[in-house]
């Protein structure tokens, strides 16, 4: 078993397990189940699966050029001859039936051998591309899932802001009625309440859109989703050095692996094109049988009939040496060489892209964790500020706008904190994808951070 074949078999096993598990739940209750549902229903992944199945046929197609071909031909004819000459007429009528079997076995066809090796590489390339599609599915599901959770948290924060602004509006109105505040305070509170209501409506609409985006991937309307458990800590990348991740990405990134295989295929194509100048040798064998039945009559009372049978077989070698093909073979060789150079440049570009992706994802994780820590402190500070401003307003040392600003600041801090957490979680997956190691185990690890729906 070759390394490519082994990898294909492992991918087929992974695909079978994913499909088997996808039918076990009717709802996308958590991240892991969402991924499994998407593996069965997502249109892009289904297209990638079909392409993977098609790519697996490259190997038997290439092998066919090394195997013998066997053909059978047959014919039947009716003969009718009427010969007129001086003194007599000759009439001959009858059937001739024949068949032949031809066998051809390539002995030396270098183009066919190279094509077979290309088939092995193309099968491996199909497996890598399918793995890319699977990693892309994980990222799309995770992004859509956490987009929903982020939209839910944003809606909750804005709902709380709208309620708080409404309470502050009522307080401003009652204070105005007793003459402790001016009408300006009422108008400010009314403006903040209206703005909070508008933001809440927009957040609800955004949540609906995010739900539909997730439903598009998982193939069904998601029910209640498991949210991130409170107090969950985010782990730093392991290894915790950007250089290690960059090194892994430059060798293990699936885009790099795909381009490496594409380069090998292009190199084989150069070899196959140049092989057009080489001779070919085939073993050929045939067997033929024919049988004729005819009746002959002349200008005499009697007529004669007869049967003729023939059998024959041949076996030998056939050499074909191309001498001149109009320059087509040389042109195809130059074309293949240019495409090989293109594949080499594509590989270099893939390595650079993997390098950048690893750096961006690593910084996304590390800077995201720093942002989460800072925003957690900001949330606590904003909450303390709100309580202090409320107390100051009650005793007359703070004005209405101070309380409104503190409420808005707390809502903003909570929304930014939620987004930073979810962005960091997705960045962790993107870092694994950049290194080429992202798999269902990573989805399960993130899923363990979630509570129950």
Predicted feature descriptions by range:
Residues 80, 361, 414-453:
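Acidic, low-complexity, intrinsically disordered peripheral segments
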Residues 27-147, 151, 165, 183, ...:
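Short flexible linkers and secondary-structure junctions
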Residues 2-3, 136-250, 262, 364, ...:
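Periplasmic alpha-helical coiled-coil/stalk elements that build and connect Gram-negative outer-membrane
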Residues 26-73, 81, 89, 105, ...:
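Bacterial Sec-pathway N-terminal export signals of envelope proteins
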Residues 46-50, 60-64, 107-134, 188, ...:
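Sec/SRP-type N-terminal targeting helices
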Residues 21-23:
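N-terminal signal peptide c-region/cleavage motif recognized by signal peptidases
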Residues 176-180, 393-397, 434:
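A short glycine-centered flexible hinge/capping loop motif at secondary-structure junctions
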Residues 73-105, 228-239, 267, 271, ...:
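Small/polar, glycine/serine/threonine/aspartate-rich low-complexity segments that form flexible
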């Amino acid at each position: 078993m070759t390394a490519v074949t082994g990898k294909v078999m492992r991918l087929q096993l992974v695909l079978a397990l994913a499909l088997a598990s996808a039918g076990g739940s009717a709802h996308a209750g958590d991240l892991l189940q969402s991924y499994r549902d998407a593996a069965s229903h997502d249109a892009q992944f289904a297209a990638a699966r079909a392409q993977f199945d098609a790519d697996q046929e490259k190997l038997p197609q290439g092998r066919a050029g090394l195997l013998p071909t066997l053909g059978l031909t047959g014919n039947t004819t009716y003969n009718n001859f009427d010969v007129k000459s001086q003194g007599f007429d000759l009439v001959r009528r009858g059937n001739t039936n024949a068949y032949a079997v031809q066998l051809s076995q390539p002995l030396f066809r270098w183009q066919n051998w190279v094509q077979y090796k290309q088939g092995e590489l193309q099968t491996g390339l199909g497996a890598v591309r399918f793995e890319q599609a699977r990693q892309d599915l994980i990222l799309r599901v995770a992004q859509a899932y956490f987009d929903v959770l982020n939209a839910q948290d944003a809606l909750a924060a804005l709902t709380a802001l709208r309620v708080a602004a409404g309470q502050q509006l009522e307080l401003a109105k009652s204070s105005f009625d007793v003459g402790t505040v001016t009408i300006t305070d009422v108008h400010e509170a009314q403006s903040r309440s209206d703005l909070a209501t508008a933001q809440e409506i927009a957040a609800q609409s955004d949540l609906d859109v995010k739900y539909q985006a997730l439903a598009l991937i998982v193939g069904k309307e998601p029910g209640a989703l498991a949210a991130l458990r409170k107090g969950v800590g985010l782990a730093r990348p392991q290894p915790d050095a950007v250089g290690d991740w960059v090194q892994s990405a430059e060798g293990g990134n699936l885009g790099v692996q795909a381009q490496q295989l594409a380069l090998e295929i292009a190199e084989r194509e150069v070899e196959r094109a140049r092989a057009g100048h080489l001779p070919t040798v085939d073993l050929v064998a045939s067997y033929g049988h024919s049988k004729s039945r005819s009746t002959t009559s002349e200008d005499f009372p009697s007529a004669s009939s007869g049967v003729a049978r023939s059998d024959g077989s041949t076996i030998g070698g056939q050499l074909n040496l191309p001498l001149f093909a109009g320059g087509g073979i040389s042109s195809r060789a130059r074309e293949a060489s240019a495409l090989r150079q293109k594949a080499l440049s594509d590989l270099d570009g893939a390595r650079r892209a993997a390098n950048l992706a690893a750096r961006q994802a690593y910084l996304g994780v590390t800077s995201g964790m720093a942002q989460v820590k800072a925003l957690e402190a900001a949330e606590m500070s904003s909450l303390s500020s709100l309580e202090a401003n409320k107390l100051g307003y009650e005793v007359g040392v703070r004005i209405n706008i101070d309380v409104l600003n503190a409420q808005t600041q707390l809502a903003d801090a909570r929304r930014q904190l939620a987004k930073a957490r979810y962005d960091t979680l997705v960045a962790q997956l993107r870092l694994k994808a950049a290194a080429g190691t992202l798999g269902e185990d990573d989805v399960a690890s993130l899923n363990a951070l979630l509570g129950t729906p």
